[in-house]
Amino acid sequence: MTDLEIYRKRLERIEELLSELSEYSGRGAIIIVEGKRDVLSLKRLGIEGNFELATHQSLFNFSEKIARLGNEVVILTDWDRRGDILAIKLSGYFQSFGLKPELEIRNKLRLISQKEIKDVESLYTYVSKLRLKTGYCSKRDFQ
């Protein structure tokens, strides 16, 4: 497989995950991220919705507040050590409140991006770089 084919495949898989994330968002799911730059990156990729920052209060209280809303929850913390710990703790708290959070999108993004990026805030730049290398443009590029 050539580098171009590898980049195309990665971009295709990331676009599929972004589409899935957009579907969750459209159903009213709460997308949990670590910081404001994560939100900005996702919005630049065309993801709109209800974003919540998990880093400004006790995780237990945060999880309880979100669980009370009764919405689906997507955990999209960074895929570094701190983000891994945060995802595990949040997932445990949500499960104790009867919610099964979506973690697959995060896990797949981690695998696809390999060691090239480790955080959500870099996702927009990474996708833009892949689009440039493959000559691919999506309608989101022109919004």
Swiss-Prot record:
Cofactor note: Binds two Mg(2+) per subunit.
Keywords from the named record: Magnesium, Metal-binding
Cofactor(s) listed in the protein's UniProt record: Mg(2+)
Binding site for Mg(2+) 1: 34, 78
Protein name per the record: UPF0292 protein Mbar_A0484
Domain of life, source organism: Archaea
InterPro entries: TOPRIM_dom, TOPRIM_RNase_M5-like, UPF0292
PROSITE patterns: TOPRIM
Binding site for Mg(2+) 2: 78, 80
Organism annotation: Methanosarcina barkeri (strain Fusaro / DSM 804)
Protein family membership: Belongs to the UPF0292 family.
Ranges where the Toprim domain occurs: 28-109
GO molecular function ontology, one term from the record: metal ion binding
Metal-binding keyword on record: yes
Pfam families: Toprim
HAMAP family, per database record: UPF0292 (MF_01095)
Coiled-coil ranges from the UniProt annotation: none
